[in-house]
Amino acid sequence: MALRFPRFSQGLAQDPTTRRIWFGIATAHDFESHDDITEERLYQNIFASHFGQLAIIFLWTSGNLFHVAWQGNFESWIQDPLHVRPIAHAIWDPHFGQPAVEAFTRGGAIGPVNIAYSGVYQWWYTIGLRTNEDLYTGALFLLCLSAISLIAGWLHLQPKWKPSLSWFKNAESRLNHHLSGLFGVSSLAWAGHLVHVAIPGSRGEYVRWNNFLNVLPHPQGLEPLLTGQWNLYAQNSDSSSHLFGTSKGAGTAILTLLGGFHPQTQSLWLTDIAHHHLAIAFLFLVAGHMYRTNFGIGHSIKDLLEAHIPPGGRLGRGHKGLYDTINNSIHFQLGLALASLGVITSLVAQHMYSLPAYAFIAQDFTTQAALYTHHQYIAGFIMTGAFAHGAIFFIRDYNPEQNEDNVLARMLDHKEAIISHLSWASLFLGFHTLGLYVHNDVMLAFGTPEKQILIEPIFAQWIQSAHGKTSYGFDVLLSSTNGPAFNAGRSIWLPGWLNAINENSNSLFLTIGPGDFLVHHAIALGLHTTTLILVKGALDARGSKLMPDKKDFGYSFPCDGPGRGGTCDISAWDAFYLAVFWMLNTIGWVTFYWHWKHITLWQGNVSQFNESSTYLMGWLRDYLWLNSSQLINGYNPFGMNSLSVWAWMFLFGHLVWATGFMFLISWRGYWQELIETLAWAHERTPLANLIRWRDKPVALSIVQARLVGLAHFSVGYIFTYAAFLIASTSGKFG
């Protein structure tokens, strides 16, 4: 008999129903559950798949470069970044009539095109790319890297090149190489690129391989480095009248501490960025030499952890047993990696708009909005994944004997206190915030807006003032003109910071009031509730008072049959599933807040946000409804326009989102009956009954239907908001 899908599970392959296909797809990446898997093969498979992942990333970025070089307008955009719209790629669509062709032909193109809202033009311009040839070269280079990655992945699956289990378990060596090699050397290389290519490029000097060795990045070369006069590299920085990409107003400094933004590009000074990467490189190169490997010097991570026993025995045996627990659990390691990456991604969203690093990106409002929203949603999915794998760790990998009375065991021992405190915080935030919003709604409805409860965020304003924002009149730390920190800041360090923080045209430390106070607490409610669900799911994954033997049922189970009431919906998977809805809604509030606040800032009518954001009707009417007007006007006498595609996507997103509920609010028996009726009709219909199936059609399992529903809900939700965000922003600002 020919091998049927899935080949990794002979038990599933022999299943006579369509369950074989769905369960096969669901467990394809759960290598641990595959037939004949060993720990060594598990590590080797994951290692090889990383190369495949890299190949896909390189291919994708290569495609971006290639299409912009081929169909974009990079060279004409460079001439006037503020007024030429950057083109992502051409659109070829046989359905386009003349109105559509005209609507989508823009940015100086000869036919219909898509506009780029990803910020790649600004990024490439900042790092020194100037011609289409540069873009093609980059695309080709990344294509080669992609091919090399694929070959490396294949190679590491060959018997001779398969790394051993001990190689994967060597934490010290891996940490040294990742810290020094991955972060240290790459940061140093990037600092080098900025100094040798990007900074000269910003001063009108075109450095490529043919003149790379002839152009000195600094007039004094390596002399200041070798003689210890490093401050010479910071002298004669670009002036405030510097025109980016030209020598007009340019200086010669390469490593500075100016602070603030380049007046023309509204982005961080390139010389500050180079300095930052050099410092990061130094730190990581040092950090990558800290752990003990072949030479018997440096720290042993196990010894470090075992020594961490808090005084007074207040945390039991401290970190004893943690080294082996983490080192032997891929899920624990993945959970830690995802938690870190999730936080970093959210920080990227925050910093890309508040401290923009790329030239002219701050004036491309649609791109700013798209990048913020994109990174926040990505962060949300990554963070929920961290808790999912944390729960799988507790079910599959946690060993109580190995972790007796250490910090991990003690987390489980007092989980009731953790969960109930989170629950209390969520309830407090939810009822108080909703209470304030609803009170304000009623006051507005009754025509007495002066009776609203409006709370000034004085603590946050004080923190902003301490960092130098003077508009609140707090006169503290950096906003106190008489203080030593203020006076030192004008000359010694970051002289541009205080100018930037008090400049109203950027997004640095936005002025906040009662509307911000309320939405901040609404977001805090969402964050705490999402965390509550995720933390409870992980801490109760092994068992709870209701179901002490939960771990024996695995990560995702629907119920333990009818004989045992109350065991439905309490698997660790169900907690993850529920948390994703909360995560999406929380990030919805975050992005609504960010977008509305910025639209009013960019349009110069901040009072609209300040006055309308203190009650729910204000959000619904003046943000959602008002800004979706271009998307919901249906067919009109003017026909097609460049926002039509977003209007269609807005509708389609709602459709996908609503389809999710068909899977979420239904029961398996209903679908099973429907399928059997359809199968009966199929078998009795002439011609149709010539087509037979090998697998008996059965309804999706409860857990699978939930996953399908969740996927539709998530994708529809994001499609809908993406269309709204891009159309409402580009419709106003072009």
From Swiss-Prot:
It is a multi-pass membrane protein. Chlorophyll a B3 binds at M662, Y670. GO terms for cellular component: chloroplast thylakoid membrane; photosystem I. Pfam families: PsaA_PsaB (PF00223). [4Fe-4S] cluster binds at C559, C568. InterPro entries: PSI_PsaA/B, PSI_PsaA/B_CS, PSI_PsaA/B_sf, PSI_PsaB. This is Photosystem I P700 chlorophyll a apoprotein A2.
